[in-house]
Regions:
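Short carbohydrate-recognition loop motifs
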Residues: 1-9
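Extra-cytoplasmic beta-strand recognition segments
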Residues: 18-34
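Noncatalytic modules at the cell exterior or secretory-pathway interfaces
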Residues: 24-28, 67-82
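Short, surface-exposed beta-strand/strand-loop-strand elements in extracellular ectodomains
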Residues: 35-48
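Short beta-strands within extracellular/lumenal beta-sheet-rich domains
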Residues: 8-21, 60-63
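Exposed low-complexity, polar/acidic, P/S/T/G-rich flexible segments that act as propeptides
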Residues: 40, 82-92
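Acidic surface patches and DE-rich sequence motifs
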Residues: 9, 44, 57, 80
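Extracellular carbohydrate recognition and processing domains
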Residues: 48-70
Length: 92
């Protein structure tokens, strides 16, 4: 699994990862130091990054996602409300 680092962004008031470019499906695991929220934004064909709907994205310390890449390339960015302990992903 590959590690992803997040830095605090005062404008977003959140911990933010760099934009990840994905070429195929991944398994994503996010573990927070304290309970918090997660938001994932995914690129669209216009260069915008709208939110990806997530059912249970609040008041949890550990999140696991399977992200399917339908077009050739997808870019995502991850935002967390509390400091992440680890963010990892693996191609599947």
């Amino acid at each position: 699994m590959e590690n992803v680092t997040a830095t605090y962004d005062a404008n977003e008031l959140a911990w933010v990862t760099p934009i990840l470019t994905l070429r195929r499906d991944i398994f994503l695991r996010i573990t927070l130091r304290e309970k918090g929220k997660v938001v994932i934004r995914q690129s669209d064909d216009k260069g915008n990054f709208p939110r990806v709907p997530i059912r249970r994205h609040k008041d949890t310390q550990s999140f696991e996602f399977r992200i399917s890449v339908i077009p050739d390339i997808v870019q995502i960015q991850i935002f967390t409300s509390t400091e992440p302990k680890e963010i990892k992903y693996a191609y599947i």
